[in-house]
Each structure stands twice: as structure tokens, then as C-alpha cells.
Amino acid sequence: MAHKKAGGSSRNGRDSAGQRRGVKRFGGQSVLAGNILVRQLGTKFHPGTGVGMGRDYTLFALIDGVVKFEKYTRNNKVKTRIHVLPVEAAAAA
């Protein structure tokens, strides 16, 4: 009788893949127009000069340049804005 009794079945044991959100290009990095800067849910980061925002709140570069993160205050809350500065302007700053 070399039989093995059936083991119980688990009702857990599954997981969904991560959605790969987060900052993709950091301050001081060079970017090309169209590069994705941040994937996010809602506006954790706000678009500044040279940055566009997609339907899903993805921030992307509109121009070639250098990424700059800036903290600012609005309604007594500290928020973060992301700019893409042209290479000449970034060198001067």
C-alpha cells in the first residue's frame, strides 16, 4: 500500500505583481524630452517648468535638460515640484 493520502489545499498562496511606481529620474540627472520622471498615484509630486502630466498623474519631461526638485509651501503644506531646466540654464544655476 504505497499510497499517499491527499494533502489539504491552501486558500491563500497568490499575490499581485508590483506596479513599479516611484521616481525614475532623480535631481541633477540629464533627461530627454518624453522621459518619464515619476510614476505616482495622485499628485505626490507636481509638474513644474518643462514637465507635463499624463492622465494617470505620470510626470514626464517636455524638453531636454536636467531634473530639479523644488519644495514649496501652499495652504500651509510643503509640496514638491519637479522642473526640467534646459542645459544652459542648469549650468548657470
Swiss-Prot record:
Q: Name one GO cellular component term.
A: cytosolic large ribosomal subunit
Keywords assigned: Ribonucleoprotein, Ribosomal protein
Q: Which organism is it from?
A: Solidesulfovibrio magneticus (strain ATCC 700980 / DSM 13731 / RS-1) (Desulfovibrio magneticus)
Residues annotated as transmembrane? none
Name it.
Large ribosomal subunit protein bL27
**Belongs to which family?**
Belongs to the bacterial ribosomal protein bL27 family.
Q: Name one GO biological process term.
A: translation
What GO MF terms are annotated? structural constituent of ribosome
Q: Is Cell wall biogenesis/degradation one of the keywords? A: no
Q: Where is this region: Disordered?
A: 1-26
Q: What is the lineage of its organism?
A: Bacteria, Pseudomonadati, Thermodesulfobacteriota, Desulfovibrionia, Desulfovibrionales
Q: Name one Pfam family in it.
A: Ribosomal_L27
